[in-house]
Curated annotation (Swiss-Prot):
EC number(s) per entry: 7.2.2.-
Keywords noted in UniProt: ATP-binding, Cell membrane, Ion transport, Iron, Iron transport, Membrane, Nucleotide-binding, Translocase, Transport
UniProt organism field: Bacillus anthracis
Top-rank taxon, per record: Bacteria
Gene Ontology process terms (BP): iron ion transport
All copies of domain ABC transporter, residue ranges: 5-241
Protein name: Petrobactin import ATP-binding protein FpuD
UniProt function note: Part of an ABC transporter complex involved in ferric-petrobactin uptake. Probably responsible for energy coupling to the transport system.
Amino acid sequence: MQKALETKRLTLSYGETIIIDELNLEIPKGEITIFIGSNGCGKSTLLRSLARLLKPTTGDILLDNQAIQSMQTKQIARQMAILPQGPQAPEGLTVLQLVKQGRYPYQTWLKQWSEKDEEMVQNALAATGMTEFAERDVHALSGGQRQRAWIAMTLAQDTDIILLDEPTTYLDMTHQIEVLDLLFELNETEQRTIVMVLHDLNLACRYADNIVAIQDKQIYAQGKPEEVVDEKLVRDVFRMECQISTDPLFGTPLCIPHGKGRRVRKEVAHAMR
């Protein structure tokens, strides 16, 4: 397995609170890796550290076998892009202006905007279906369109690795699938390494080549969804009882949570008669 990213005995902390403790992780190159886990388990913290947005307390993070702490910022930005959760664009910024920001790592005092930069921006707009919205204000877009605009910016950055923190947050079901399908296509057609945090376990199973379940500051399980996602994992990681079935469309694990819902309401109403 070729590794795009790797951590060695990585410990991450906020103040004196340890979030991730001596974690060893390998991110496969050219695959979609999705972090899952309960709220507060450290998924987003881990993702931020991979992007060098959070300095490790101890341990190493390797990008193509080189410690990222020793690399220049622009050098990293030419190899890895990150889309944080809920990014906000300045008022009045157009889609085209936003996407152009993805070319910042390639700008210098001597080398300003080039034909290559323009080509990468136009290709990014086309790949995300945003060409027709290029002159539209980012704030005038729907949720799904706005997220596609941000993804276009990361594509314009032209990196082999894209990190995304909960890219479907605040999106309705249609736009969630739209964004995840786009990321899937980028991985399939361009072999980009995609690493993201998702809350929806069923969508994670559907789109991931590689699932990383995080619990108690460590990796609970890692591997293909069909190999690692079972009722015990859901019970241990999410503290929830469920039934694992098979997605009838994709053949991936399908988590059906235990709960009350309408059936229980009907049973209670019947018992009260």
